[in-house]
Amino acid sequence: MVMSCTDPRTLIQHLSTTYPEATQLAPNSVGALQFVFPDGLVINIYPMGTIHFQGQASSIRAEVEALVLIMNKR
């Protein structure tokens, strides 16, 4: 699934703080920052706010989707 976030920097800060167990990988050649969670979920966040979810079903994904929807309403 693909989503768009109006404030990717705040999302990245939130994920780093809320999910310290996730591995945060440095931006790749196209600038995407990647979070890899212990349950197999992978979230790629691109500089312009595009978010790609990969991996198996995860309750974290639902939490992040809800957060992005709230952030986009600001």
What is the predicted role of each segment?
Residues M1-V42, V64:
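Short Lys/Arg-enriched alpha/beta "domain-start" segment
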Residues S58-R74:
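Mixed-charge, Lys/Arg-enriched low-complexity segments
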Residues M1-M3, M48, M71:
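Detector for methionine-enriched segments
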Residues L41-E63:
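Intrinsically disordered, low-complexity regulatory segments enriched in Ser/Thr/Pro
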